[in-house]
């Protein structure tokens, strides 16, 4: 059951939950650029304490396409947070005005705290370094829309796998499907041990690789996240590693013809812009699908199936 449910961690959702969400999201695609009065009179409160473009805008557009309204803020500037108001008090006030709340925060556990305080359902729009459940839902939905299925696919995840919360949530979502995951990164940027322990306990098939070119011919999906420059003490070491994980036309010469490339965005330089014009590039479509996916999520939580 989705109605009235909080969305805090990817671990909370089953394959059945995801398949129900995907079915409704596919129906919502017809309304993604129009307006349907399914949630007329409902109010979404957004509390984005961290910068966001795609996540915040897609949630706001999704609510408005459903006929609802949006209040809230992006960044603490100009709010009582600047005066020292606690997160708990901010959530209490937003809860008083809203039927559903979306929060993004730099601290892990912020969304869980909000859910404990608020009477309205709370959706985690990204908190800390490890949780971004709706992005993972979108990622897997995009794969499902492109192939028509998820089971049996080989999925490569490339880049900084330790510090990207999208990677953590994606892995925790993919455990619900029969996939093989190729984790492609420097050894010191592999996912944290807690994540590996979890996917192993769920029986996921996975393997570690130092380079993309050695496995590109096996992959159906390449999911790219940026190498985070700020994690490197030696700039030369960063430049060396960055180049070896960049997606270029040359890297793709041995790829399957039906390979798709995904990226949670924003992109820096980890995908060559020449790749944008190829059939492999699905990251902008992926971003666009964020609206119907989040329309479905909001609708199921507020109205039920």
Swiss-Prot record:
Which residues are recorded as binding carbamoyl phosphate? Answer: 54-55, 104, 132, 135, 265-266
Residue sites binding L-aspartate per the record = 83, 165, 226
Pathway assigned to this chain's UniProt record: Pyrimidine metabolism; UMP biosynthesis via de novo pathway; (S)-dihydroorotate from bicarbonate: step 2/3
E.C. number, please? 2.1.3.2
Give GO BP annotations, semicolon-separated. Answer: 'de novo' pyrimidine nucleobase biosynthetic process; 'de novo' UMP biosynthetic process; glutamine metabolic process
What superkingdom does the record give? Archaea
Q: Tell me the protein family, please.
A: Belongs to the aspartate/ornithine carbamoyltransferase superfamily. ATCase family.
Sorted alphabetically, which PROSITE patterns does this protein's record hold? CARBAMOYLTRANSFERASE (PS00097)
Query: What HAMAP family does the annotation carry?
Result: Asp_carb_tr
A single GO CC term, please?
Answer: cytoplasm
Which Pfam families does UniProt cross-reference here? OTCace, OTCace_N
Name of this chain's protein: Aspartate carbamoyltransferase catalytic subunit
Question: What is this enzyme's catalytic activity, as reactions?
Answer: carbamoyl phosphate + L-aspartate = N-carbamoyl-L-aspartate + phosphate + H(+)
- Keywords of this protein's UniProt record, alphabetized? Pyrimidine biosynthesis, Transferase
Role summary: Catalyzes the condensation of carbamoyl phosphate and aspartate to form carbamoyl aspartate and inorganic phosphate, the committed step in the de novo pyrimidine nucleotide biosynthesis pathway.
On subunit structure and binding partners, the annotation says:
Heterooligomer of catalytic and regulatory chains.
Concerning SUPFAM superfamilies, the annotation shows: Aspartate/ornithine carbamoyltransferase
Q: Which GO terms describe its molecular function?
A: amino acid binding; aspartate carbamoyltransferase activity
